[in-house]
């Protein structure tokens, strides 16, 4: 009787820990990428091999998109596609030293006590290029968006 209780409690704990640990995984690589997405990526970046993730975006998280993360010209980069292969954006990490002087001056003037955590060059599907600079203010990640010329556009709480 004691052995069966011990066995049952062990099985319960094992099952519970397995189920619980699966909920801790935030994002798993996507293996079922639609053919139009793979084809569009291969055409644009023929020598790169991405790791794919799927996510829902949009105002009410209603748009399924596919993000491919890869190295391009020695930069961590990613692309975001709709399921039909339509390119939404290309994002490339940039070093703080590569940001336009106007952006650095703005950040030093307005947010000198908040160090830049990361920066990216974003090209949207309409070929509009922006810089996104991430900082942490009061434990909240804030993205400052700038034009290609370095003019401040908006802040995004992310």
Q: Whereabouts are the PLM-identified features?
A:
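Bacterial Sec-dependent N-terminal signal peptides
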Residues: 1-27, 41
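Interaction-mediating elements
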Residues: 23-158
């Amino acid at each position: 009787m004691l052995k069966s209780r011990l066995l049952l409690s062990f099985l319960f704990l094992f099952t519970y820990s397995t189920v619980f640990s699966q909920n801790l995984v935030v994002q798993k690589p996507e293996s079922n990428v639609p053919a139009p997405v793979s084809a569009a990526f291969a055409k644009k970046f023929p020598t790169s091999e991405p790791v794919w993730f799927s996510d829902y975006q949009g105002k009410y998280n209603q748009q399924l998109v596919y993000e491919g993360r890869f190295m391009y010209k020695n930069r961590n980069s990613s692309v975001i596609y709709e399921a039909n292969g339509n390119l939404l954006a290309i994002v490339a990490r940039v070093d703080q030293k590569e940001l336009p002087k106007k952006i650095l001056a703005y950040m030093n003037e307005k947010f000198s006590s908040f160090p830049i955590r990361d920066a990216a060059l974003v090209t949207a599907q309409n070929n509009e290029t922006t810089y996104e600079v991430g900082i942490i203010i009061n434990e909240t990640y804030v993205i400052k968006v700038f034009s290609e010329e370095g003019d401040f556009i908006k802040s995004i709480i992310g």
